[in-house]
């Protein structure tokens, strides 16, 4: 028996992990003539605020808020109910946005500078008692701190510091896989009664990308909001965006709400998902057959297993996806108890049905 533990932090659809006899010359097509096996794992119930809709933010405004009430869409003036939720205890945060300014002049300002958008997460204490938060792991990166290097996207990541090479999403995921907290983030913070604090902010030049993943625990109830501010000079300017009651422009799925409800389109996540961890255990004899297990399977792509590995939302904005499609910010911990005479190859693949083209999985896995 060869135990193999594979923690992954993933955000891609339709990943599959086959364990197959090592080929003498070349790999055959993934799963050719073979079937996949469901993992039959489970998500935990840790609430995670996801701010990913709109992915491409066009200007200043609120992105998502869990306070009671509503905010007005920049495109239509329509009031949209907030993703109302109060956190208390263990929690998580996932933020992923691009800045594509509606005002195209901000792409290139005088002096060769680009206009900047500040993404910020705000903590809100609605009650009469102070709330203390402790953070155990996480990071915030933008694409200028962690750029994509197209010629060096994959590779082994040593345990020590290294230049990130696969973008801000991978940079933050690696920090989570290592269970480390970015030294630039506070490991604890107290929100006074009836108060609001800016937890962190990152300035994002036009056409840039930012990603944040964070895990923590509170000793009392609190709420969160994520906002975008153009050229703020202080935290007061950031809080003023929340007080404006105006959503950031770029919500392209507002006109497709019926298609979201019917399942015709996924949209992106703006709300609170239940689950930051998925655990499964598989026993298999490789002398009997290869093993194929899907990761992040959906109702559209389950590889014949009938298993949907997507966690639900406890609260969502109207134009959000119906669940945490893509399982962003979820750590998949899969324990493979394998036996066989070997040698065998462990392959992480991103199969595309019917030869269609998709963005390849470029995330990180940890193997123990």
What would you call each of these model-derived segments?
Residues 1-8:
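Bacterial N-terminal signal peptides that target proteins for export
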Residues 30-92, 96-98:
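N-terminal, Lys/Arg-enriched amphipathic/low-complexity engagement segments
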Residues 150-205, 368:
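Intrinsically disordered, low-complexity Pro/Gly/Ser/Thr-rich segments with frequent PxxP/GP/PP motifs
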Residues 192-321, 325:
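Acidic, serine/threonine- and glycine-rich low-complexity intrinsically disordered segments
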Residues 97-101, 109-117, 122-131, 137, ...:
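Asparagine-centered strand-capping/turn motif at beta-strand->loop junctions
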Residues 88, 184-197, 207, 288, ...:
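Solvent-exposed, conformationally flexible loop/turn segments
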Residues 14-23:
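C-terminal segment of classical bacterial N-terminal signal peptides
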Residues 140-156, 223-225, 354-367:
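Short aromatic-acidic-glycine turn motif
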